[in-house]
Amino acid sequence: METDIVINLRCKLKEAEEERLKAAQYGLQLVESQNELQNQLDKCRNEMMTMTESYEQEKYTLQREVELKSRMLESLSCECEAIKQQQKMHLEKLEEQLSRSHGQEVNELKSKIEKLKVELDEARLSEKQLKHQVDHQKELLSCKSEELRVMSERVQESMSSEMLALQIELTEMESMKTTLKEEVNELQYRQEQLELLITNLMRQVDRLKEEKEEREKEAVSYYNALEKARVANQDLQVQLDQALQQALDPNSKGNSLFAEVEDRRAAMERQLISMKVKYQSLKKQNVFNREQMQRMKLQIATLLQMKGSQTEFEQQERLLAMLEQKNGEIKHLLGEIRNLEKFKNLYESMESKPSVDSGALEDNTYYTDLLQMKLDNLNKEIESTKGELSIQRMKALFESQRALDIERKLFANERCLQLSESENMKLRAKLDELKLKYEPEETVEVPVLKKRREVLPVDITTSKDTCVNNSAVGGEVYRLPPQKEETQCCPNSLEDNNLQLEKSVSIHTPIVSLSPHKNLPVDMQLKKEKKCVKLVGVPADAEALSERSGNTLNSPRLAAESKLQTEVKEGKETASKLEKETCKKSHPILYVSSKSTPETQCPQQ
């Protein structure tokens, strides 16, 4: 039975969702068609405006086209000549800069090449000298080895002492000869190094001479450029003197002033014509937009009611999903309980078997006692973990139950908010109808103080802070007295905000009816209206309506309406003052209670 009921409810829910989707599609199509028609109408209006402006301004443009074209041609020719001269000067400067940069780069590269050549020559010379020294050392080594060999042979042959002395002198002379040869070689190496240094210095002298010539050429080019600049400066000075003389000439001055006045007059006439045409078109567009806004407000109120009913279906789906999840968890837990019971039975059967055979195995009791102690410890740990697991499950169930309660409260508050917003839109639509009905045709020029767009609350995924703000907006629409607005502006917790919102919806809705109030003078009303505009930022349409109602107090309905507006504005003044005082007193913790209540926690886990 329960499954059949659930299936029927799901079928009904699917049908309702399909109908809602179809209605949304039709609504989107209607909105798109309406937008297309609005765009076409705007295009036609703009085309009419442009046509009228063009026809009315042709008589002024045709007279001045020839003069403008001639002036433009003269100015363009002057600009072309000036641009040509500037381009020529720029090209010359670029050529000079490129030549200078090229010369500098070439000089740098030449200096680098010369340095590399010098280093290469020095490396080659050092390599050559080292090779020569190595060869010389090899020859000396071979000679010395030969002499040692000969000496050893002669010593073995037992020479006389005289021959040995002569041989020793000969070896000394040969060593002196080798030292002298080494000194000669070192001097030759030094001479070669000095010759290489002299050649490098000669190359540097040549390079410095070339740089000197290039610098002289650059100095000459700089001097020529300076002479050209002096000539250009003289020409500009002559032109400046001519311009000053023309400015001091009374004839040219009078003509220029008359031309400026004529140009300004023509421009002002064109602006006047275009502003008249735009004023007429914008006046018609304003009337049409008011009618469209009235229709849109009524449609939005109906859509808000439909969306309020939609939230109930979403809550049903969520609750059904949670119910299925909990049923699955219960089945899983039952299966675990059965498995644990089976394991317990097996464990008891295993314990009973060794108790039967205990009489035969009295000698091997040590190991059995040890295993028994381990099993007891494991059983105690299992029982403790089971207790902790049950505690955690109870905590999880408690948290889920609390989350469900919070979700229920949240859905109830959202439902209440949607109802209040739909009623708010209906009341706004009624107020606009009354304004359009009783508004006089005479237009009064009102200085625009503040421009604010009216945001229509279509998307209703609001948090608790937005609920507080919407309750404040609802207080403005429902025309609450000052004492009750004090109670709504200074809440202590989020629950108080929600309760006050429900009370304001249920109790203070019939206060909108136009009832007679205390008679106030017109001057006091105008003063209060000005103060209210500065504080609250009332739109220009409401201000114009209040001024018109203050000027035309002959009919009783308009008088009652103006009195109602003045009293509402007094209430707004007091509410705004109280809000400022509360914000000054408790600035860092606005609308948040100090205790951690269940409503302040996250409702979804």
Swiss-Prot record:
Name of encoding gene: SPDL1
Basic and acidic residues biased stretches: 564-581
InterPro entries cross-referenced by the UniProt entry: SPDLY_chordates, Spindly/BICDR_Dynein_Adapter
Cell compartments where the protein resides: Cytoplasm, Cytoskeleton, Microtubule organizing center, Centrosome; Chromosome, Centromere, Kinetochore; Nucleus; Cytoplasm, Cytoskeleton, Spindle pole
GO biological process: cell division; cell migration; establishment of mitotic spindle orientation; mitotic metaphase chromosome alignment; mitotic spindle assembly checkpoint signaling; protein localization to kinetochore
Broad class of where this protein is predominantly found: cytoplasm
Disulfide cross-links: none
Family affiliation: Belongs to the Spindly family.
Record's protein name: Protein Spindly
Organism domain of life: Eukaryota
Entry keyword Electron transport: no
Function: Required for the localization of dynein and dynactin to the mitotic kintochore. Dynein is believed to control the initial lateral interaction between the kinetochore and spindle microtubules and to facilitate the subsequent formation of end-on kinetochore-microtubule attachments mediated by the NDC80 complex. Also required for correct spindle orientation. Does not appear to be required for the removal of spindle assembly checkpoint (SAC) proteins from the kinetochore upon bipolar spindle attachment.
Entry's Gene Ontology molecular function annotations: kinetochore binding
Keywords on record: Acetylation, Cell cycle, Cell division, Centromere, Chromosome, Coiled coil, Cytoplasm, Cytoskeleton, Kinetochore, Mitosis, Nucleus, Phosphoprotein, Ubl conjugation
Keyword Acetylation: yes
Modification sites for N-acetylmethionine: M1
Entry's Gene Ontology cellular component terms: centrosome; cytoplasm; nucleus; outer kinetochore; spindle pole
Phosphoserine PTM sites in chain numbering: S513, S515, S555
Coiled-coil intervals, chain numbering: 3-442
Quaternary structure annotation from Swiss-Prot or TrEMBL: Interacts with KNTC1 and ZW10. These interactions appear weak and may be transient or indirect. Interacts with dynein intermediate chain and dynactin (DCTN1). Interacts with the catalytically active form of USP45.
Location of the region described as Disordered in the Swiss-Prot/TrEMBL record: 545-581
Modification(s) after translation: Monoubiquitinated with'Lys-48' linkage. Deubiquitinated by USP45.
